[in-house]
């Protein structure tokens, strides 16, 4: 574990002034695909960088995996998984927030090619639920949410002979 901590850069926790070691890179194929979608969203130049998990204090964007199920399992055990990704936003200006979430959905669903990695590939992104207001905080920040459906093809690498017992 100390090797991992030594090899990562320090990350400042928002609003704390302290730094914590960055977490090790994900090896989950689903998480790698979600991180790729987050990179696509950040490339749009929104009012904030998207984070994973709950929204923090102040204007921001976040995402997290919502309940999803495997859609298809093939004879070779590869799977097609439509992952619902909940996008949440908070901003004092409702128009900026609404425009941002709508732009994310409009742009990502119109791409014709997506990112892939070792053992996974995003094959499509579609709209789940369109952006909608879910509330307004006491500090006058509007809260909105929407869902993207990230369609992932997970392909396992061929097992070697020692794994097959041959």
PLM regions: where:
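Conserved acidic
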Residues: 29, 96, 140
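A general secondary-structure boundary signal
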Residues: 34-38, 80, 139-142
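Extracellular/virion structural assembly segments
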Residues: 78-80, 90-113
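Small/polar-rich, solvent-exposed N-terminal microdomains that initiate assembly or binding
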Residues: 1-75, 99, 111-118, 161-166
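Short, solvent-exposed beta-alpha or beta-beta edge segments that form flexible loop/patches at the rim
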Residues: 45-95, 123-125, 129-132, 145
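Acidic-leaning, charged glycine-interspersed low-complexity segments
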Residues: 47, 108-166
């Amino acid at each position: 574990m100390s090797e991992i901590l030594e090899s990562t850069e320090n990350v400042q926790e928002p609003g704390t002034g302290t730094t914590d070691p960055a977490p090790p890179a994900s090896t989950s194929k689903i998480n790698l695909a979600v991180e790729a979608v987050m990179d696509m969203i950040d490339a749009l130049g929104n009012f904030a960088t998207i984070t994973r998990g709950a929204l923090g204090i102040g204007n921001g964007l976040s995402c997290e995996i919502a309940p999803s199920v495997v859609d298809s399992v093939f004879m070779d055990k590869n799977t097609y998984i439509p992952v619902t990704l909940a996008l949440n936003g908070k901003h004092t200006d409702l128009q900026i927030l609404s425009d941002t979430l709508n732009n994310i959905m409009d742009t990502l669903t119109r791409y014709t090619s997506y990112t892939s990695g070792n053992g996974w590939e995003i094959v499509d992104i579609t709209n789940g639920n369109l952006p909608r207001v879910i509330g307004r905080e006491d500090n006058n920040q509007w809260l909105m949410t929407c869902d993207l459906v990230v369609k992932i093809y997970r392909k396992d690498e061929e097992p070697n002979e020692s794994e097959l017992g041959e």
